[in-house]
Amino acid sequence: LGLGQPDFPTPEHARTAAVEAIESGATDAYTSNKGTVELREAIAEKTARDNGYDVDPEHVIATAGGSEALHIAIEAHVDAGQEVLIPDPGFVSYEALTHLAGGTPVPVDLREDLTMDPADVEAAITDDTAMFVVCSPANPTGAVQSEADMREFARIADEHDVVCLSDEVYERIVFEG
């Protein structure tokens, strides 16, 4: 287990918008390194609507994909020799991106229901820990952390002064049952 691969097509409205942008010439030049203003504003609106908190579009960076965003976050917060706690099994790039930053990946085994146990994360934290990664819904298992677990991860990050990198790439891909 290491990689989740969606098995559904790109939504029609997204395909149509991409074709229209190409045909209108809107894609003929570079954008800001942070992404277009319109996209960053849309991300801020989505965050307020769906996640319940406000984000200034000036503080939003739209990346070319999730791996680029993870790379930027890990490089920004992990110094050489520092540890990053990662779910095991988990997305294959967590380990590689930690190595690229000069860090040491520390696998944290999942529970039988394939979620991370906050107690296991807290027990694995050392003086060298810079960050721990939580992915929910998880890649590649699809397991979803409970709200109580997520609140506990926030407490752990605050109390231990470490970064909790919450990988939410699949936040809308949740199936009941």
Regions found by a protein language model. Give the residues of each.
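Short glycine-rich anion-binding loops that position phosphate/pyrophosphate groups of nucleotides
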Residues: 6, 67, 91, 136-139, ...
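Active-site phosphate-binding strand-loop segment of PLP-dependent enzymes
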Residues: 112-176
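PLP-dependent aminotransferase-like
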Residues: 58, 75-130, 134
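N-terminal small-domain helix-loop-helix segment of the aminotransferase-like
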Residues: 2-65, 72
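Conserved catalytic-core motifs of eukaryotic protein kinase domains, centered on the activation segment
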Residues: 7, 12, 54-55, 96, ...
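Alpha-helical structural signal in soluble globular domains
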Residues: 17-21, 42, 46, 97, ...
